[in-house]
Amino acid sequence: MSGSRRLFLKELCVAMLAGRLGGKAFSSETKKIKLPIAFSTLGCPAWDWQKVLEFAHQHGFSAIELRGLEGNLDLPSHPVFAVGRIEQTKREIREKHLKIACVSSSANLYFSDKDKRAKELGDARRFIDLAASLGAPYVRVFGGKEQTDTSRFPDEQTKARVAAGLHELGNYAGPRGVAVIIESHDHFTASASLKDVLQAANSSHVGLLWDAHHPFAAANEEPEFTVKQLGSWIRHTHLKDSAGSGEDRKYVLTGQGNVPIRRQIESLRSIGYKGFYCFEWEKVWHPDLQDPEIAIADFARVVGECLGNRQACGG
């Protein structure tokens, strides 16, 4: 074969490859490397579905945690997730190269009243069905706490009810490819209470959503201790920063408070955590917080730097 023919074939192959890649094979535009970061839609209650997807895509997020949409916390009833719309919704998620990290319900499992308990478990099942339809791995539930209960820790009867609820929901979720995760929150913030409940639930379809802020801020636990106690159950995590202490503690932009976020991340890394590092900005509950356009983008920058540079995490 002559040299000119070889050159022609080489150029032809290059041209064909460039065409398959939409003409971008040799352009300066390269696909952004996405880190395992996510944000909860709790932080952007005014955004519509398209803005949620576009913002996540543009700021390098890999996933979204669904916790309400356009002010509607009852996600299964939102039109975006209706039977006739959900396939389009899934396509839109894929087109932005995103995943759904978790579908977060409001279900509380502490109730002793039979009717209230049945309602909470029923709501959790609806969210499990939605997660299964979306291909999401987890549904969040709460242990919860009576508003009139001033005790620091749940009693044995409450722990038993919560564990039984988790086990029941795990049995429902498992065959649907979903796991139920209890969040470190309310009465179930300290490692000891969570460990008791997770052990009693005794299900491979039950795990923990480690809201890393609450055990530190409310239970005075260092992240290394919490992860040592509960690491084998951690499936998903919430990260957020705050300043102050006790009742005076206020949420602030990531890195501007006194929550040891870098140590929390390193503690998860130390156990080979493979989940998402999810920003939960409680804009729904605290409307005076910074707007999500600022706070969520800031989280992507600060935690993205931490994940991309071990030295930035103190390790």
Task: Give the residues covered by each predicted segment.
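C-terminal segment of N-terminal export signals and the immediately downstream linker at the start
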Residues: 23-47, 51-55, 59
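Active-site acidic/histidine proton-transfer and metal-coordination neighborhood
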Residues: 11-20, 51, 87, 92-102, ...
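Conserved beta-strand positions in the central sheet of alpha/beta enzyme cores
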Residues: 65, 102-104, 140, 238, ...
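Acidic/histidine-rich catalytic cores of soluble enzymes
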Residues: 34, 63, 103, 164-258, ...
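N-terminal export signals
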Residues: 1, 7-28
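Conserved, mostly hydrophobic/aromatic
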Residues: 39, 56, 64, 93, ...
